[in-house]
């Protein structure tokens, strides 16, 4: 059976008090609507239509060709919004789910189960519901004496008795697609808001003797909509708890989950330890038996087995097996560290390849460079790679030793088994097996201060 989805993303989000389009506010580093799209796609949907309004181009820019789009010029209610997808879906067979673009916590598993329940019951419509302690603001699920759905009533149209009901509509539905678009034309706006409500489609189906199901989820957080910055923070916290819980169940030690931020696209191997205050973002891959020390930040990087990152920042870089970084080091984009490398305190690496066993232990800048196997770079070494207009490359061969306080003025190549004396400023290439000294000879004037 064909499956379709409509994502409602046209709301202005005035309560966010922001210039940014509501569904583009981020949770765990991604726009809310992108989380929704990924869950919808993951549930086995064949085609997605996103309803956009104010800020339409911004949404299209984020979602791209993963969705079709329909424009809702005036926000006249959820039924009116769904009707905007008519040109894409009206004649389609199968099941259509309707999901709000501001529900970033909804999972593909819940959507899969909703669809399966709907199709197994041969229903014309199914609503996803939940029971919550504070149902204010949500539509209430009103059931008849036999426990079947009688109607969904919105907060502003509810009687006091109906407001006391704690089973609420999530705003997420599954429909027989053709029934949905047939009934949408019959929805009226005679309610307190003067809007066209999507739940009225369910009442129309029931009035015609059709089957309407309710599928209740036990995970209330999944259906939480985000309407303001407080709720955005709550969604962020919920997403982080979910992510950390997943990693801990898969063999990762997170010492203080409440202070640890891990993005949804991060992968972490077993027996890795994450210390307090760590942030790991983007498409980062971390191997097994890694230690990420407290207050480190890692973005879009690869950390191989057994590595240790101590109080450092790693951006768009790769760290080899058993390599040690930090404390207080920075790996900038393009830094590639091999196995058993050491990058120590107050070292900055940018667009540089440090081969296996290389060491840069203290107070150095290595940029646009290749450092050979087992080479030691002394404290205070600087690759002078920029002349104000262009960047130039430094190459240091294997098994070389660069002394402290050395300037390597690029472009320059240092060979294998080379010793560069401390305090040198190297401007010319140095061949293999050489000693390079480039500093003024010391002059001592005894008794000068007497």
Curated annotation (Swiss-Prot):
Listed Pfam families: Hexapep, NTP_transferase
PANTHER family reported in the protein's UniProt record: BIFUNCTIONAL PROTEIN GLMU, NUCLEOTIDYL TRANSFERASE
Reactions mediated catalytically: alpha-D-glucosamine 1-phosphate + acetyl-CoA = N-acetyl-alpha-D-glucosamine 1-phosphate + CoA + H(+); N-acetyl-alpha-D-glucosamine 1-phosphate + UTP + H(+) = UDP-N-acetyl-alpha-D-glucosamine + diphosphate
Binding-site residues for Mg(2+), renumbered to this chain: 102, 227
Database matches in PROSITE patterns: HEXAPEP_TRANSFERASES
Name assigned to this protein: Bifunctional protein GlmU
UniProt-annotated location(s): Cytoplasm
Chain segments carrying region Linker: 230-250
A GO molecular-function annotation: magnesium ion binding
Alphabetized UniProt keyword annotations: Acyltransferase, Cell shape, Cell wall biogenesis/degradation, Cytoplasm, Magnesium, Metal-binding, Multifunctional enzyme, Nucleotidyltransferase, Peptidoglycan synthesis, Repeat, Transferase
Pathway listed: Nucleotide-sugar biosynthesis; UDP-N-acetyl-alpha-D-glucosamine biosynthesis; N-acetyl-alpha-D-glucosamine 1-phosphate from alpha-D-glucosamine 6-phosphate (route II): step 2/2; Nucleotide-sugar biosynthesis; UDP-N-acetyl-alpha-D-glucosamine biosynthesis; UDP-N-acetyl-alpha-D-glucosamine from N-acetyl-alpha-D-glucosamine 1-phosphate: step 1/1; Bacterial outer membrane biogenesis; LPS lipid A biosynthesis
Gene Ontology terms: biological process: cell morphogenesis; cell wall organization; lipid A biosynthetic process; peptidoglycan biosynthetic process; regulation of cell shape; UDP-N-acetylglucosamine biosynthetic process
Gene (UniProt): glmU
Region of interest (N-acetyltransferase), residue spans: 251-450
Function according to Swiss-Prot or TrEMBL: Catalyzes the last two sequential reactions in the de novo biosynthetic pathway for UDP-N-acetylglucosamine (UDP-GlcNAc). The C-terminal domain catalyzes the transfer of acetyl group from acetyl coenzyme A to glucosamine-1-phosphate (GlcN-1-P) to produce N-acetylglucosamine-1-phosphate (GlcNAc-1-P), which is converted into UDP-GlcNAc by the transfer of uridine 5-monophosphate (from uridine 5-triphosphate), a reaction catalyzed by the N-terminal domain.
Organism: Staphylococcus aureus (strain MRSA252)
């Amino acid at each position: 059976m064909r499956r379709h989805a409509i994502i409602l993303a046209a709301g202005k989000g005035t309560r966010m008090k922001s210039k940014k389009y509501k569904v583009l506010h981020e949770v765990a580093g991604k726009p809310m609507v992108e989380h929704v799209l990924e869950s919808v796609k993951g549930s086995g949907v064949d085609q997605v239509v996103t309803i956009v309004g104010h800020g339409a181009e911004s949404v299209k820019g984020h979602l791209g060709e993963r969705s079709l789009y329909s424009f809702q010029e005036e926000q006249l209610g959820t039924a009116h919004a769904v009707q905007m997808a008519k040109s894409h879906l009206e004649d389609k067979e199968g099941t259509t789910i309707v999901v709000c673009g501001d529900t970033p916590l909804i999972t593909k598993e819940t959507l899969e189960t909703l669809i399966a329940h709907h199709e197994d019951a041969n229903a014309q419509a199914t609503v996803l519901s939940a029971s919550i302690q504070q149902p204010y603001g949500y539509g209430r699920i009103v059931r008849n004496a036999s426990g079947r759905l009688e109607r969904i009533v919105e907060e502003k149209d509810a009687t006091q008795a109906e407001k006391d009901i704690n089973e609420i509509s999530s705003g997420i539905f599954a429909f027989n697609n053709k029934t949905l678009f047939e009934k949408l034309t019959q929805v009226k706006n005679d309610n307190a808001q003067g809007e066209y409500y999507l739940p009225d489609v369910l009442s129309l189906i029931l009035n015609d003797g059709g089957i309407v199901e309710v599928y209740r989820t036990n995970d209330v957080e999944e259906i939480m909509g985000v309407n303001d910055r407080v709720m955005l923070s709550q969604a962020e916290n919920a997403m982080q708890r979910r992510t950390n819980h997943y990693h801990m169940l898969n063999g990762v030690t997170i010492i203080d989950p409440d202070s640890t931020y891990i993005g949804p696209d991060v992968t972490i191997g077993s027996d890795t330890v994450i210390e307090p205050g760590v942030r790991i973002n983007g498409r980062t891959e971390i191997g097994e038996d890694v230690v990420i020390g407290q207050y480190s930040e890692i973005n879009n990087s690869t950390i191989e087995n057994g590595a240790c990152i101590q109080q450092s920042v790693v951006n768009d870089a790769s760290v080899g097996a058993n390599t040690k970084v930090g404390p207080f080091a920075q790996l900038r984009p393009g830094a590639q560290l091999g196995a058993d490398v050491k990058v120590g305190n107050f070292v900055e690496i940018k667009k540089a390849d440090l081969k296996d066993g290389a060491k840069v232990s203290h107070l150095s800048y290595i940029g646009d460079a290749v450092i050979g196997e087992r080479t030691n770079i002394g404290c205070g070494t600087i690759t002078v790679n920029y002349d104000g207009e262009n960047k130039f490359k430094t190459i240091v061969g294997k098994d070389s030793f660069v002394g402290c306080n050395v300037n390597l003025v690029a472009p320059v190549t240092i060979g294998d088994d080379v010793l560069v004396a401390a305090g040198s400023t190297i401007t010319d290439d140095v061949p293999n097996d050489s000693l390079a000294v480039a500093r003024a000879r010391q002059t001592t004037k005894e008794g000068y201060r007497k």
